[in-house]
Every structure is written in C-alpha cells, then in structure tokens.
C-alpha cells in the first residue's frame, strides 16, 4: 500500500452461561482492538472474551456499521456481524442504523448504545467513521456505556478511531481520533500491509505508541491494572520509544 502522504470453546461457553446470570463489570469497562478480517476463523477467542466481559450471551450487543456506509456496504457488513455473534451464542445482537452525522445525533440510536454492554465498530472508511462519531450524541452514549462497564470493540478502522490518533491512508494524513486510548495509533492488518505504514509514522509522530495488530488478532485490556492480553491467530507489535516488541497470543503487556 503506497498511500502514506472440554475444549477452549466449551470452557468459554460454561463461563459465559455463568456470567450471563451475573451483573456486568462494575465501573470502567473494557476495550478490544482487532486488526481486521473479523467475523470468522480465529477471531472466536477475542470475541468470546468480549462477550464474557460484557456479561454473557444475553448481553445486548450493538454493531456500528458506519465505516461501511460510504460504499453502501453497511447492510451486508452489519448482517455479517449479527450472524457471527449469534453463531458464538449471543442472543441480543442488533446493527444500528448509524450511517451519517445526522443519524449519529439521533436520540433513539444514542439510547440503544447507552443500554448496550458490547459496542462493536466495524471496519471500512476510517476518516468517515471518525468524523461521523466525533462529538455526537451516539458516541457520548457509547462512552457512558463504557464508563458503566460495557465493552467497546473495534476492528480495523473501528480500532483505529478508538485511539488518540489514526492514519487516513487515502489522504496520507494523521487525524485526532476518539481518544479512548491516549498516545496511541493502531496499524491494522499489520501482517499484510499495516506494517508498511510504520517507518514514516515513527518519523512523523515519534512520541506516539504504534500498535501493530495482525489480522484475526485482538488485544483486550482485561489484565490486572489494565494490562493488555493478546487473543487470536497472530501477533501484536508495539513500536514505542524507539523499540519494537512483539507479543504472541497469551502474552500480557502494558502501553
């Protein structure tokens, strides 16, 4: 890309069935960043963990398909998300019709997100997603849900806008994100094209931690003292203070 201007599954089911009868995590919630190629294959582990942290299979899951709206792919992408989470056992999954800045200020959509326990931002057009959600009632509601224990998750563009900064490859520019994770920028699809962004971004924003996340891989801040854990098929690569560190599934780290 040139534009730089008892199985583990059974154990999860047992834990989720138990957690569905309990209240969700009190206080600040959890964040899940995924590197792309969501809704299939080896993404089962991070997504099941997110459902567990959200309170179990009965937890309300709300999918935000905004990033797929510019090329009219939002309905297909949203339906893929619904089918995926239902295949994992989730009972209450809806793709919200948040496709524009006007819809981002719709009070009914905002209330649906405020009541959610897992909010999932799909991939697609990064800058469109960031600009649509920025300073909106919908995003304010999502943050309220997070402060009350919900999980906010994002894949590819969805993960990118969750950080303080994101890179828009179509314009070759760095923009301010939604800042759930300060001093960071996600490099999605790191094992395919995302790693190619790293050299110039390190020069452009040297004080920002770059989070290179492979496809079919997620990182969740579910460890003690908000430590991050790696789930899924690939690796997470941290570019921080001039160092490059690679973490495997099962590894724990801080940012």
Predicted regions and their residues:
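General beta-strand structural signal in soluble alpha/beta enzymes
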Residues: 33, 94-95, 120-121, 152-155, ...
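A general structural motif
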Residues: 28, 56-61, 116, 149
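Class I SAM-dependent methyltransferase SAM-binding "motif I" and its flanking Rossmann-like core
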Residues: 122, 128-195
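A residue-level signal for conserved active-site and pocket-lining positions in enzyme catalytic cores
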Residues: 61, 119, 156, 186, ...
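C-terminal and late-domain segments of enzyme folds
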Residues: 18-57, 67-79, 83-87, 168, ...
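Short hydrophobic targeting helices and cationic amphipathic motifs
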Residues: 4, 11-14
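Portal/gating segments that form or line small-molecule/metal binding sites
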Residues: 68-123, 128
């Amino acid at each position: 890309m040139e534009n730089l201007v008892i199985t583990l599954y059974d154990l999860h089911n047992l834990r989720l069935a138990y957690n569905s009868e309990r209240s969700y995590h009190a206080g600040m919630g959890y964040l899940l960043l995924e590197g792309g190629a969501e809704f299939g294959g080896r993404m089962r582990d991070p997504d099941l963990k997110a459902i567990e942290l959200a309170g179990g299979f009965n937890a309300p899951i709300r999918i935000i398909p905004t990033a797929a709206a510019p090329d009219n792919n939002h309905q297909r992408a949203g339906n893929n998300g619904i089918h995926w989470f239902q295949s994992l056992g989730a009972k209450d999954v809806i793709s919200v019709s948040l496709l524009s800045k006007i819809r981002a200020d719709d009070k009914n959509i905002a209330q649906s997100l405020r009541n959610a326990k897992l909010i999932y931002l799909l991939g697609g057009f990064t800058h469109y997603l960031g600009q649509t959600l920025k300073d909106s009632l919908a995003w304010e509601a999502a943050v309220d849900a997070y402060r009350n224990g919900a999980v906010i998750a994002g894949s590819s563009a969805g993960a990118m806008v969750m950080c303080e900064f994101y890179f828009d490859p179509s314009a070759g520019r760095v923009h301010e994100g939604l800042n759930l994770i300060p001093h960071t920028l996600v490099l999605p699809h790191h094992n395919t094209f995302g790693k190619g962004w790293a050299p110039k971004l390190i020069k452009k924003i040297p004080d920002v931690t770059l989070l290179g996340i492979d496809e079919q891989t997620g990182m969740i801040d579910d460890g003690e003292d908000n430590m991050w854990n790696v789930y899924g098929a690939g690796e997470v690569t941290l570019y921080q203070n001039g160092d490059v560190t690679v973490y495997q599934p099962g590894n724990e780290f801080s940012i």
